[in-house]
Every structure is written in structure tokens, then in C-alpha cells.
């Protein structure tokens, strides 16, 4: 499928900050379901624009959120404001069907995905790749991934490597157990030997075979929970 990838800028919900981002859209007539991509901290944008292009080839409108304009470790307030700006921007994209909206979170973007789903009822699905880099003790109370996830009611798919250096497998197993105990619609898939960043081509931890498997699983999850 022919797709269009372009640089875009939207205004944060604070009404002041410009957030440079990327938008990928299918060329065929819409409206199309939407994926908001919340990138990780490390690496250039190229790996994420490739992911956006791939999603557009599947038939999704995809926005790579440029949250790094805030720096590598922003506080929660600006993140929420920028997420609001992204939602407003997507509402202006003619081909975007916000009744079918998913969020992909990578690394720290996994935490932001949980924040987004708690704040915006339009979000119907979350997919997290090597995410939930657990936050330092200085993080505000209730802001750990465990706590954020408890307030999420939409289906969530978590794709994680057993050798992740940023979000250790033991932490992820505990999170999986907590989500199950709470009765959440949440699927965890662990890839033996995969490191942090396995799904992003420009990341040092990239693993082509694991990336392909994880995106195949994400595509099936979207087809089940979002396409209808």
C-alpha cells in the first residue's frame, strides 16, 4: 500500500509549546483506525518513523509523538499537556477515526501510554514494547507503572525481552501477576534472550526476528480489539 509520511507540528495542551512530530497515513480513502506512537528515550527518530510507515501500510493513521522536546526525563505535567495536544491534533486529521484509537509505547513511552489511557477515554487499546522503564524513587507517588496500570481498563499487550536491562524481567513478572489478580484484559509475551530496544531498528538492542514476531503479535491484537 502506498503511504504518506510527513513532518508535522502540533501545539501542546499548555497552549504554548510546539511539539515536532511525524504523521504517516495510508493513501487510500479513510477513515482509518489510529495508532499514537510514544517513543523511547534513546536513539534517533528514524526507527520510529519506520514503525509509523509500517502501521500506515497496515491501514492505520500513525502519529509519532515528539515528546522528547521536553528532554529525556520530563515531569508528568508537561507529558499530560502534550498528550492532550496530540489528541487534539489527531482530531483534525481527516482520515483519522478516533473511535478506533490505540497507543504504542516504547521504553519510557510505555509509561506515557498508561498515562494517556487513564486521561483519555477515546483510547481503546495499549501495546507496549520493551516498556515500563521503572521510574526513580523521586517520581511522584502513584506514578509507578504498577500504580498507573491499575487505573487502565482497556485491553493491553505487553511485549518484553527476558534480558531487558532497563525493565528487569522480575519487575515485569510482578506486574503481570498484579494485572491478572485485578482481572485486567492484559497479555504478556516474553521473548527469550531479547534485550531492551528489540523492536526499534536504530536501537542497539534491536533483534530483527524478535521485532518481526512482536509486530505480528501486535497486529493480531489490534485486529481483535480495535478494527471493529
State what each model feature region is:
Residues 122-133:
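A conserved short beta-strand
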Residues 7-96, 138, 144-145, 197-203:
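Serine-hydrolase catalytic machinery in alpha/beta-hydrolase-like enzymes
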Residues 103-105, 129, 159:
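Short beta-strand immediately N-terminal to the catalytic nucleophile in serine-hydrolase-like folds
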Residues 95-106:
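Alpha/beta-hydrolase fold nucleophile elbow
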Residues 152, 158-160, 164:
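Short beta-strand/loop motif that positions the catalytic acidic residue
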Residues 105-109, 113:
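Gly/Ala-rich beta-loop-alpha elbow adjacent to hydrolase catalytic centers
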Residues 165-171:
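Conserved alpha/beta-hydrolase "acid-adjacent" motif
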Residues 182-228:
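C-terminal catalytic histidine-bearing segment of alpha/beta-hydrolase fold enzymes
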